[in-house]
């Protein structure tokens, strides 16, 4: 378990098999989970429909809390899917970690900075498109010079720092959690029964804590995404 990422080259470009496989697993789990929860919808929800409606209300609450009412509905579905995808991505490495010949094959996609920075780039780019669509090109760029022109370089630094912190925060938490689980698993088999007795309870406790951390990081990511979009839409 663990090791270097499994990569291959195509047309001079290097592709990461680990991220492709792990991401595909997350997509499949997300699709079938939402498909299963949304089957047999009724006016009086029961079972899986209750869970689905709770998640929808939860993410809708995030959007409504950050965005003006006239635009919140447009981004509700995006935030819902993003939250579910991130939550499952954060938990995948706690359920499945598989390696072969010194290479990682399956892990949490969000334990790789390339994945999290790409998601952060998509979120920040969407916020800029939303700002242009709402305010127009002139109004969008005018915000960078408010309340006075000297704010322009400061706001550029702020934009870059928002991008970095959004992607690195979730990566750091998920990567650190999985790394500690690997260390505890290695310690369990290092000196036989004594270390196994000590490390196994610690690993169970840390896995439970990592589930909580993964949920919090998914919540933080989607909340900050809605904040960034709201700022561009409202011009604040």
From Swiss-Prot:
Keywords: ATP synthesis, Cell membrane, CF(0), Hydrogen ion transport, Ion transport, Membrane, Transmembrane, Transmembrane helix, Transport. Key component of the proton channel; it plays a direct role in the translocation of protons across the membrane. The chain crosses the membrane at residues 17-37, 76-96, 113-133, 170-190, 196-216. It is a multi-pass membrane protein. This is ATP synthase subunit a. CDD domains: ATP-synt_Fo_a_6. PANTHER family: ATP SYNTHASE SUBUNIT A, CHLOROPLASTIC (PTHR42823:SF3). One of its GO terms (molecular function) is proton-transporting ATP synthase activity, rotational mechanism. GO terms for biological process: proton motive force-driven plasma membrane ATP synthesis. It is found in: Cell membrane. NCBIfam families: ATP_synt_6_or_A, PRK05815.1-4. Belongs to the ATPase A chain family. GO terms for cellular component: plasma membrane; proton-transporting ATP synthase complex. InterPro entries: ATP_syn_F0_a_bact/chloroplast, ATP_synth_F0_asu, F0_ATP_A_sf. F-type ATPases have 2 components, CF(1) - the catalytic core - and CF(0) - the membrane proton channel. CF(1) has five subunits: alpha(3), beta(3), gamma(1), delta(1), epsilon(1). CF(0) has three main subunits: a(1), b(2) and c(9-12). The alpha and beta chains form an alternating ring which encloses part of the gamma chain. CF(1) is attached to CF(0) by a central stalk formed by the gamma and epsilon chains, while a peripheral stalk is formed by the delta and b chains. It comes from the Bacteria.
């Amino acid at each position: 378990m663990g090791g270097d990422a499994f990569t291959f080259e195509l047309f001079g470009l290097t592709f990461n098999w680990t991220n492709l496989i792990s991401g595909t697993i997350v997509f499949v789990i997300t699709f079938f989970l939402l498909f299963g929860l949304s089957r047999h919808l009724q006016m009086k929800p029961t079972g899986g429909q209750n869970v689905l409606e709770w998640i929808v209300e939860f993410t809708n609450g995030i959007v409504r809390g950050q965005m003006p009412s006239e635009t919140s509905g447009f981004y509700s579905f995006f935030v819902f899917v993003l939250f579910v995808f991130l939550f499952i991505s954060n938990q995948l490495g706690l359920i499945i970690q598989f390696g072969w010949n010194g290479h990682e094959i399956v892990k949490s996609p969000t334990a790789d900075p390339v994945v999290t920075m790409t998601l952060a780039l998509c979120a920040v780019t969407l916020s800029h498109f939303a700002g242009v669509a709402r305010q127009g090109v002139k109004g969008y760029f005018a915000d960078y010079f408010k309340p006075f022109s000297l704010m322009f370089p400061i706001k550029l630094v702020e934009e870059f720092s928002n991008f970095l912190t959004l992607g690195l925060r979730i990566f750091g938490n998920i990567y650190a959690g999985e790394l500690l689980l690997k260390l505890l698993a290695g310690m369990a088999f290092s000196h036989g029964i004594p270390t196994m007795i000590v490390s196994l309870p610690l690993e169970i406790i840390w896995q439970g804590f990592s589930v909580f951390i993964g949920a919090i990081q998914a919540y933080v990511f989607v909340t900050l995404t809605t904040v960034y979009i709201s700022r561009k839409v409202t011009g604040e």
